Amino acid sequence: MFMSSGKGLTMLGDDAKGLRIHDLVKAPANTPWAKERQQSWDASYPATVYSTPEMTTDGQPCSAVTVILRTKGCHWWWSSGCTFCGYFNDTRDDVNSDDLHAQWQHAKEKFNNFEGQAMVKVYTSGSLLEDREIPVDFQETVLRDCFELGKELIVESRTEQLTEEKLAWATSINPNFTVAIGLEAYDDEVLRFHVNKGFSARSWDRAVERLQKFNLRVKTYLMFKPPFMSEADALDHCVKWIEAVAEQSDEISINPMNIQRGTVIDRLHRHREYRPPWLWSLVKLIQQSHHIVHPNGGLNGDDDQISRLIIHPTAGGKIRGSHNCGECDGEVVAAIERYAVSGSLNEFDGLDCECKKRWNQELTNDRSIPVPLGTSMPRRGSLRDILRSP
């Protein structure tokens, strides 16, 4: 359904500039609640700034500050968007360079110019190196400040921004930083039909080649259980994707699906047509993939490390994030978080719960009988009450 607007659709032969698709249709970002929320944000303050335990590039434990800036959002979302991404909820269309510099200054002041923080992660709900999203002068500020302060820098980018020209410019300011790419799946069918990513696995390969040419570190994001995929398929596919990208990635960050408001996956979840992954599946994924990143069974920082495997379950233990029965969730999430730092499978010793039998049965069912993809039974409450008609 088209929204009323003073300007209509651009017709063939008309030289007028066309409106964005999100201005023309009732996309989630154009709903009244989304518009009201966007305009309520103070553009001079970042979305959030916080510190977490991390590992330096040479394997030493450290503290890292994460700066999530409030921006215009991702250019891919302007025209289409990924099925799972709700980062548009934290954006404002009118953010400019002055606003971004004010946000950056606020982040530095909050952590005393990042004193005691070995690493700075800068996230923009899009790509820092995309000129359509982020003014070039602000890109330069982030790159230069982190270089002059001696901080390890991590930024995010889609593949299309990582041209030789752009990387040559960026490395002339900061010659040593990490670029995190949201690949999500090393599978073109999944990228197109499950995720709607807007690029191919081959485009990731080419981007990584260019990053390595400029001696930049590569962090690869993979999605666990994208929409329209069963629990067992998610586990089997993700192990294969880890194996496919490990040699080219300094770090692999697995992002278990969490439900973000106003997205395709949100609608599926509300209609009981999708359920986030089990925490047990994440433990199994780590156990099946550890030998890929540590062929000799080592720990993070050991000589056998090919890549570092990281999982930080967003909303872990909650219904809209990876969860189990509710009794064991906290303990399992904590073990997964510890593994991300230590790289030790011993973190999972002694973990058990009655719900593990139900999880195992679900995997068996997924592999033996046809079921609606990604649904699965609820894991909490009485099964009799869940199945009873309302």
PLM regions with names:
Residues 126-128, 159-161, 185-187, 224-228, ...:
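Active-site-proximal loop/turn and secondary-structure-junction residues that shape catalytic pockets
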Residues 202-263, 283-313:
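Conserved C-terminal portion of the radical SAM core fold
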Residues 132-140, 163-172, 231-232:
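Distinct, well-ordered alpha-helical segments
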Residues 160-163, 196-198, 227-240, 275-280:
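Active-site glycine- and acidic-residue-rich loops that bind
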Residues 41, 45-102:
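Canonical Radical SAM [4Fe-4S] cluster-binding loop centered on the CxxxCxxC motif
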Residues 108-115, 142-148, 168-176, 209-215, ...:
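Acidic (Asp/Glu)-rich catalytic clusters
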Residues 86-103, 107-134, 145-162, 176-204, ...:
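Core AdoMet radical
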